[in-house]
Curated annotation (Swiss-Prot):
NCBIfam families: L28. This is Large ribosomal subunit protein bL28. It comes from Desulforudis audaxviator (strain MP104C). The keyword ATP-binding does not apply. InterPro entries: Bacterial_rp_bL28 (IPR050096), Ribosomal_bL28 (IPR026569), Ribosomal_bL28/bL31-like_sf (IPR034704), Ribosomal_bL28_bact-type (IPR001383), Ribosomal_bL28_sf (IPR037147). Keywords: Ribonucleoprotein, Ribosomal protein. Belongs to the bacterial ribosomal protein bL28 family. It comes from the Bacteria. GO terms for cellular component: ribonucleoprotein complex; ribosome.
């Protein structure tokens, strides 16, 4: 399962977690993805989109 938005392409970002004693360990930031039924080329399909695309109106929901 890809952790990537089907519309904007937003995906996982890798960085470092920094503890109080400045020990660095790798960690990931994952986008807030939701599975929604949306119209893609005029047909309803289940796609995985981030909440920013949902809120901005880039998704046409299928009823």
């Amino acid at each position: 399962m890809a952790k990537k938005c089907d519309l904007c392409g937003k995906g996982v970002v890798v960085g470092m977690k920094l503890s109080h004693s400045h020990i660095r360990t790798k960690r990931t930031w994952e986008p807030n993805l939701q599975r929604v039924r949306a119209l893609v080329d005029g047909k309803p399909r289940r796609i995985r989109v981030c909440t920013r695309c949902l809120r901005s109106g880039r998704v046409i929901r299928a009823v």
